[in-house]
Swiss-Prot record:
Keywords: FAD, Flavoprotein, Oxidoreductase, Tricarboxylic acid cycle. It comes from Corynebacterium diphtheriae (strain ATCC 700971 / NCTC 13129 / Biotype gravis). The keyword Transcription regulation does not apply. Pathway: Carbohydrate metabolism; tricarboxylic acid cycle; oxaloacetate from (S)-malate (quinone route): step 1/1. Disulfide bonds: none annotated. Its cofactor is FAD. This is Probable malate:quinone oxidoreductase.
Length: 499
């Protein structure tokens, strides 16, 4: 019996098919448009507008992740703070700043302050152990070129001056400390995505909203992408030279449909998120920082609490969280069958392995799911002692799908925290799995994709890539002069030097 997809008529031939109208597809589309302006691009989005899932501003914390304040990137091992992960994340964020600056100058991202704003990044420690750790972390980072102008204090007066909401009502006997930098950012990835896609359409990219990708199958050296119009039910088949799956949580099921061996064994563990959002403008105005604390012992990195200033559509906001929940859906607007449909004979052991090993995650999720509003407010009061119930509302954030990476027995799998790139051996299809730091390092992830999937083009593309990202191929951690030049340039171009 003939495959029904194969039997269908191909309606379009394109060079690049992008699945999902979020920040990942938008970033790759912009890169390829710069490198190969003659290539045809088409983008498919199941919903009727871009950036409605994880890229939407209230579906994420909007932190420009560069390890300035996030303590999970600097673990303490045998009494020493390890900064390797922090350096790696920071280097990748510098790539983002350079790429965004290039796109600003090219008119692709014409209004940077609509999506990026300067907000201090602060690390918070309470109690003897956390304060001692925070000082060691500060000393390790402050001496490094990638972390200029880091500051630290355990002085209560300075703490109260910087973070009045966190100081007000706090016991004078509790030991606290903070380290901070004014180099932090708050980013509205929804607004950034919309600017990217407005330019993409102007430059010839066709974006089909309300179109859901149902299948992806090999067709010789190309791919047949079956797409359904969610409003009319009509089905089309597009043949593409290259397919990118930037569909957030649905990247796993779509990559499974390709049949590539590289996706075998991978799974996804969905975690829903919630925030407490402040509704009192007077309270919101008293806080101007993104403050990250330390996760509880044994808790996963996703549990790190933070009290965040947001700047969305020109208005300040304030949120606290995240609080986790559990649902089998892979997208906020997904299906309750998503998780179960993703389980295959090739990844069953991966799911079982995670279930047997991740006791910390299991305990954390059970604790979070059992929390009522009173318990959530108690967690907030560890940061903001005088928080009042009537000033905060519970909102649902985006859906995260933690990637489950296959490993050899006896463990069979491990949770891959971060962002994982999966691509076929011939480089004709690729996709992104995982969550944070996600959007913050999208340009670095797409550079890695170009190297893996278009290796034969990299020599030709090299000069243009260097125009977009002057530090390409250079570790800024070892080149203070170049870092300073790039920092000053991107600060000015992104208008981060203006209050």
């Amino acid at each position: 019996m003939a495959d029904s997809t194969t039997a269908q008529h191909v309606t379009d031939e394109v060079d690049v098919a992008l699945i999902g109208a979020g920040i990942m597809s938008a970033t790759l589309g912009a890169m390829l448009r710069t490198l190969e302006p003659g290539w045809t691009q088409v983008m498919f989005e199941r919903l009727d507008a871009p950036a409605q899932e994880s890229s939407s501003p209230w579906n994420n914390a909007g932190t420009g992740h560069s390890a300035l304040c996030e303590l999970n990137y600097t673990p303490e091992v045998k009494g020493r703070v390890q900064i390797d992960k922090a350096l790696g994340v920071n280097e990748k964020f510098q790539i983002s700043r350079q790429f965004w600056s290039y796109q600003v100058n090219e008119g692709v991202l014409p209004s940077p302050r609509e999506w990026i704003n300067p907000v201090p990044h602060v690390s918070f420690g309470r109690g003897e152990d956390q304060v001692a750790y925070l000082k060691k972390r500060y000393e390790a980072l402050a001496a490094h070129p990638l972390f200029p102008n880091m500051q630290y204090t355990d002085d209560r007066a300075k703490f109260a001056e910087m973070l009045p909401l966190m100081a007000d009502g706090r016991s004078e006997f509790e030991k606290v400390a903070i380290s901070w930098t004014d180099a932090g950012t708050d980013i509205n990835y929804g607004s950034q995505t919309r600017q990217f896609l407005k330019a993409a359409e102007k430059n010839g990219t066709e974006i089909r909203y309300g179109h859901e990708v149902k299948d992806i199958k090999r067709d010789g050296a190309k791919w047949r992408v079956t797409v359904k119009n969610v409003h009319t039910g009509d089905t089309q088949v597009i043949r593409a030279n290259f397919v990118f799956v930037g569909a957030g949580g649905m990247a796993l099921p779509l990559l499974q449909k390709t049949g590539i061996v590289e996706i075998r064994g991978w799974g996804g563990f969905p975690v829903s998120g919630q925030w407490l959002r402040c509704t009192n403008p007077d309270i919101i105005e008293q806080h101007a920082a993104k403050v990250y604390g330390k996760a509880s012992i044994g808790a996963p990195p996703m549990s790190v609490p933070h009290l965040d200033t947001r700047v969305i559509d020109g208005e300040k906001g304030l949120l606290f969280g995240p609080y986790a929940g559990w649902t089998p859906k892979f997208l906020k607007k997904g299906s309750y069958l998503d998780l179960f449909k993703s389980i295959r004979p090739t990844n069953l052991m991966s799911y079982l392995g995670v279930g047997a090993q991740e006791f910390g995650l299991t305990k954390y999720l059970i604790t979070e799911v059992m929390k009522d509003q009173a318990a959530r407010m108690e967690s907030l009061r560890e940061y903001m002692p005088n928080a009042k119930d009537e000033d905060w509302e519970l909102v649902t954030a985006g859906q995260r799908v933690q990637a489950i990476q296959p490993v050899v027995g006896p463990r069979f799998s491990t949770l891959a925290f971060g962002t994982s790139l999966i691509n076929s051996a011939d480089g004709s299809v690729a996709g992104i799995l995982g969550a944070s730091p996600g959007a913050s390092i999208a340009p670095a992830a797409m550079l890695e994709l170009l190297e893996r999937c278009f290796g034969q083009k990299m020599v030709e593309w090299g000069p243009t890539i260097k125009d977009m990202i002057p530090s390409y191929g250079i570790r800024l951690a070892t080149d203070q002069k170049l870092f300073n030049e790039i920092w000053d340039h991107t600060q000015a171009t992104l208008q981060l030097d203006k209050k």
